[in-house]
Design a protein with these regions (language model features):
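Phosphopantetheine carrier-protein modules
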Residues: 17-36, 52-66
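Short, cationic-aromatic polyanion-contact patches
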Residues: 68-76
Length: 79
C-alpha cells in the first residue's frame, strides 16, 4: 500500500473518530496540536489503523506517533 493510500485511509479514520474532515489530514499535521486528537482519541485511531491496515502498533510506539507523517511512515514500513 502506498503512502498516499495510507494517508487517505488515515484521513477517513480521523474523520470518523474526531470529526476532522479527511482532506484536512496532511502529513505535516500534528495529531494533538493541529488535529486535536488527544491520547484517548489516539487509542481509537490506533485500533482502527491496526484493523484497516493489518499492522500491529504497540503501545510503546504510539507515543512516537506525533504527526500524521509519523503514523503513515510507521504503517507503510510495517505492512
Amino acid at each position: 500500500m502506498s503512502q498516499e493510500d495510507v494517508l487517505a485511509g488515515l484521513g477517513e479514520i480521523i474523520q470518523e473518530v474526531a470529526g476532522i474532515p479527511a482532506e484536512s489530514v496532511k502529513l505535516e499535521k500534528s495529531f494533538l496540536d493541529d488535529l486535536d486528537v488527544d491520547s484517548l482519541t489516539m487509542v481509537e485511531v490506533v485500533m482502527l489503523c491496526e484493523e484497516k491496515f493489518g499492522v500491529s502498533i504497540p503501545d510503546s510506539e504510539v507515543k512516537n506517533l506525533n504527526t500524521v507523517a509519523d503514523a503513515v511512515n510507521y504503517i507503510t514500513s510495517h505492512q
